[in-house]
From Swiss-Prot:
Biological-process GO terms, alphabetical: glycerol metabolic process; membrane lipid biosynthetic process
One CC-aspect GO term: plasma membrane
Record's bilayer topology term: Multi-pass membrane protein
Species assigned in the record: Synechocystis sp. (strain ATCC 27184 / PCC 6803 / Kazusa)
Protein name per its UniProtKB record: Beta-monoglucosyldiacylglycerol synthase
CDD domains: CESA_like (cd06423)
């Protein structure tokens, strides 16, 4: 794997070089540069402000430039070719299920980790599922990091530890820092797994998941795998149904991007990372609010492959109200945008390959920059009494999203003896509903990019309320 500025290369210095380095240490300068520019909310806010001003300046200039509309159409054409590449690609097939007895088949050691804070409603279920997976008991361990819970989570974990010998519990104090990333980093050095899996406390984990995940890591360049996420309570209301369609769209894009040489991304819940890859990139970043997306970029910068397992999925509870969705998506949007601000220089200079860089640029433009640029574009259109200049790009983004959602849902919907034509009405209805739901991103992205540029971070995490809290607690108390 390539060497990066933040990796320690002192051992490669000759005595003379080491002496000179004391006077002008490039690594120290690089570290200072990183701390000042690439990390920390102050540096990020400056970069976000510069980026926001650049977006507004470019859009306004295009409106006054005689060739502005032609440039937009040219960019739309180029991105359309990239979209066609993705649409025509055939997804990679999953490797065969790992079978055989542990005495005849080498089973890698797997470590499963859950960072939990006040999760008395679901902690019992996730521990029982992880400790009962169809995988040799002596080849996988379960670590629960209790991040200073104030409810019955510690008591429940004490009972569960007596039932499951592979369960290990670490409790963090009130002064512990780093959030979820800090909790995972704290226990990583104590774990034994060749493969590290991370789950949320509300996850529903299929029993044969490890037998499906482990074969992916046979390749020495395979760094991480994301298990497709599904919404367990999808049928509740419009918001949860929209999240279900959104997950299908995400899985479709992930499959198509990976097979065309683009970027596979981690999604937190249900992610697996090779220990070697995790050590190479320095573990989880404790200065980010979306550790999964940050880790994704660093893995690709080190030229590790990131894949996706579509079936079976890991289920999680979707938020059920617009307010909860707003807070959750604000965090996702900031973290997704923040990684480009943090790592833009390395993305431009490190040898990731042109396919990955093209993929990153395409999705940065369509997913993050276009919604932000739509604000000055609309204002200029109203001022000049003309159609918005970015209309072709907007149509492309919406059309490609509809295509991906339809075929993503189609891949995940069992036929049950129906022909494609018979399935089409229901799939179209779900696609239309999902597309309407997805328009919330057109509000969130401009709001997030503006807030990141001019105001300190004020994100509020809204915890999902799990209805089975009393039931789980009673079951464990009686056992």
């Amino acid at each position: 794997m390539p060497q990066f500025p933040w990796k320690d290369n002192d051992a490669e210095l000759s005595p003379l070089e080491a002496f000179l380095a004391e006077w002008d240490d490039p690594e120290a300068e690089e570290e200072d540069f990183r701390n000042d520019f690439f990390r920390g909310s102050e540096g990020r806010r400056k970069k976000a402000a510069v980026m926001l001003m650049a977006i507004w300046t470019v859009v306004i200039t295009l409106h006054y430039w005689v060739w502005g509309s032609w440039l937009v159409w040219a960019l739309t054409g180029a991105l359309s070719l990239q979209a066609l590449r993705l649409m025509k690609a055939t997804p990679e097939e999953a490797p065969p299920l790992l079978t055989g007895d542990a005495s005849t088949v080498p089973y890698p050691q797997v470590c499963l980790m859950v960072a939990a804070k006040n999760e008395e409603a679901v902690i019992g279920k996730i521990v029982q599922q992880l400790c009962s997976l169809d995988y040799p008991g002596d080849r996988h361990e379960v670590w629960i990091v209790d991040d200073n819970s104030t409810d019955r989570t510690p008591a429940i974990l004490d009972q569960l530890r007596q039932q499951y010998p592979q369960l290990k519990v670490v409790r963090r104090g009130a002064g512990a820092s780093g959030g979820k990333s800090g909790a995972l980093n704290e226990v990583l050095a104590q774990t034994q797994g060749d493969i590290v899996g991370v789950f949320d406390a509300d996850a529903n984990v299929p029993k044969d998941l490890l037998r499906r995940v482990v074969p992916y890591f046979a390749s020495p360049t395979f760094g991480a795998l994301q298990v497709r996420k599904a919404i367990a309570n999808e049928a509740v209301n419009f918001w949860t149904r929209g999240q279900g369609a959104e997950m299908a769209l995400d899985a479709y894009f992930q499959q198509q991007r990976i097979v065309t040489g683009g970027i596979g991304e981690l999604r937190g819940n249900g992610q697996f990372v090779a220990r070697q890859a995790l050590d190479a990139v320095g573990g989880w970043n404790e200065q980010t609010i979306t550790d999964d997306l940050d880790l994704t970029i660093r893995l690709h910068l080190h030229q590790w492959k990131v894949g996706i397992l579509v079936n079976p999925p890991v289920e999680e509870e979707g938020v059920t109200t617009a307010i909860a969705l707003w807070h959750q998506r604000n965090r996702w949007a900031e973290g997704g945008y923040q990684r480009y601000l943090d790592y833009w220089r390395w993305i431009c200079t490190q040898p990731m390959g042109w396919k990955k860089k093209l993929d990153l640029f395409s999705f940065l433009l369509m997913q993050y920059l276009l919604p932000t640029a739509a604000v000055p574009d609309l204002l200029m259109a109203l001022w000049q009494r003309r159609f918005p200049l970015l209309t072709p790009l907007s149509y492309l983004a919406i059309g490609f999203s509809c295509w991906g959602m339809y075929y993503g849902l189609k891949r995940l919907t069992p036929s049950e003896g129906e022909s494609p034509w018979q399935q089409m009405p229901a799939l179209l209805a779900r696609t239309i509903g999902g597309t309407i739901y997805m328009f919330h991103w057109l509000i969130i992205m401009p709001a997030v990019t503006a807030r990141m540029a001019f105001r300190p971070k004020r994100l509020k995490w809204v915890k999902t309320v799990h209805g089975a809290a009393t039931e789980d607690a009673l079951e464990l108390k009686q056992s």
